[in-house]
Amino acid sequence: MKVAALFLCGLALATASPSWDHFKTQYGRKYGDAKEELYRQRVFQQNEQLIEDFNKKFENGEVTFKVAMNQFGDMTNEEFNAVMKGYKKGSRGEPKAVFTAEAGPMAADVDWRTKALVTPVKDQEQCGSCWAFSATGALEGQHFLKNDELVSLSEQQLVDCSTDYGNDGCGGGWMTSAFDYIKDNGGIDTESSYPYEAEDRSCRFDANSIGAICTGSVEVQHTEEALQEAVSGVGPISVAIDASHFSFQFYSSGVYYEQNCSPTFLDHGVLAVGYGTESTKDYWLVKNSWGSSWGDAGYIKMSRNRDNNCGIASEPSYPTV
């Protein structure tokens, strides 16, 4: 990890600490030289202080969720945003079909994990391929509902093979473009046959290893009511969110609400796998792709019915099979 051209002010000269040593051991950190390690330790110490200060707000009832140290502890928020996102800005083309809310009865809470149609949490690593993980997650769910078979699908194939559809591998992409590619390609390979490598490679699709097919995609009407109906009646839904904030980088537990979140600046693709209410606070249950050590075992509860916080209902979609 290169030393960024950034200097942290107001920090004393870093000295060895048990928490820093534990962090390096836990996440296998090794740095190029002493200068870089000193810089990373200073970043870690600053994040450690920010986490402590934030959790005091939780204890005082000022916020509804907690944060905790995780694998991003030696990254500034700017570095984190440059590396860990991947939902592209700009036009994605016109949707081929739209799901609209019908104001019918819906379950009070949904968790598709309990129906065994959600694969374990995956890890995109330092590659902006969130869009691929969101897309495979939605297709894995639809494939299960139709075929009663849970198959983990290849994100690496989407990274390598869908560039003609506007996607840019680790440089970012769109879930709807991934669905279009899978449809036109005649399917997507299983993860076991085409494993994830967290880097752009040449396309190695094998028609003999297809795990699922896709017949098209549907864009959900951009309201939380429609998204709730889709999650309840259709299954896990691909969504894009604003995940640019320190609070998201280190989210740990509780119902996430970020007052500075944008409903239109969407930079991260994730998967809505349910919804519910916790201590009177409505939430969306969201599967992330940063491994199980992030958040609540790889998941986050995001505020629901709070003016589309973080844009979760701004661009939902799902594949058809």
UniProtKB/Swiss-Prot annotation:
InterPro entries: Papain-like_cys_pep_sf, Pept_asp_AS, Pept_cys_AS, Pept_his_AS, Peptidase_C1A, Peptidase_C1A_C, Peptidase_C1A_papain-like, Prot_inhib_I29. The keyword Transport does not apply. Residues 17-106 form a propeptide. GO terms for biological process: proteolysis. Belongs to the peptidase C1 family. Residues 1-16 form the signal peptide. It comes from Homarus americanus. This is Digestive cysteine proteinase 3. The active site is at 130, 268, 288. The lineage of its organism: Eukaryota, Metazoa, Ecdysozoa, Arthropoda, Crustacea. Disulfide bonds join 127-170, 161-203, 261-310. Its EC number is 3.4.22.-. One of its GO terms (molecular function) is cysteine-type peptidase activity. The keyword Oxidoreductase does not apply. It is an enzyme of class 3 (hydrolase). Keywords: Disulfide bond, Hydrolase, Protease, Signal, Thiol protease, Zymogen.
